[in-house]
């Protein structure tokens, strides 16, 4: 996805994003609805049957969504614990002209995102990262 709706949890409170979870488990942003279908936005807009689908509200505090490097053409460290003095266990990069690397958001506490990148769990300082309800992949 070339564009994403990223929000900085550090700069302002992030409002939960209304998501539709389809019968296949795919999550898309809610746009509207009819009597029997949800209008959603994933890579493009489309329609999902209400039957077998559900609505969820995603936010970093609920451990939903994705985290990526805030700095254009930069990188941020993923730390073992919510402390910049702890060991670095990974990084998220944002290379100009490419889709930024992302990690699954597992929560937000005291200015730190808890993330999972390729099975490695760690922490990213919220002021150095963006949060999005949509996957970047």
Where are these regions (language model features)?
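Bulky hydrophobic/aromatic "packing anchor" residues in well-ordered structure
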Residues: 76-78
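SH3/SH3-like (including bacterial SH3b) beta-barrel domains
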Residues: 14-24, 29-32, 80-94, 100
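Short polar catalytic/cofactor-binding loops
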Residues: 24, 73-74
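Sec/Tat signal peptide C-region and signal peptidase I cleavage site
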Residues: 6-11
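Boundary regions of SH3-family modules and the immediately adjacent low-complexity/disordered segments
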Residues: 13-68, 113-137
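Bacterial N-terminal signal peptides
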Residues: 1-3
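Short, charged beta-turn/beta-strand-edge "cap" motif at the junction between a beta-strand
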Residues: 102-108
């Amino acid at each position: 996805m070339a564009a994403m709706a990223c929000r900085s949890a550090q700069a302002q409170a992030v409002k939960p994003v209304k998501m539709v979870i389809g019968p296949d488990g795919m999550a898309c942003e809610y746009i509207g609805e009819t009597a029997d279908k949800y209008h959603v936005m994933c890579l493009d807009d489309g329609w999902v049957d209400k039957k077998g689908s559900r609505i969820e509200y995603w936010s970093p505090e609920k451990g939903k969504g994705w985290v990526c490097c805030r700095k254009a053409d930069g990188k941020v460290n993923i730390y073992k614990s919510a402390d910049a003095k702890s060991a670095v266990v990974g990084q998220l990069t944002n290379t100009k002209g490419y889709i930024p690397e992302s990690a699954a958001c597992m929560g937000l506490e005291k200015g730190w995102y808890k993330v999972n990148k390729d099975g490695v769990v760690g922490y990213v300082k919220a002021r150095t990262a963006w949060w999005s309800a949509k996957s970047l992949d």
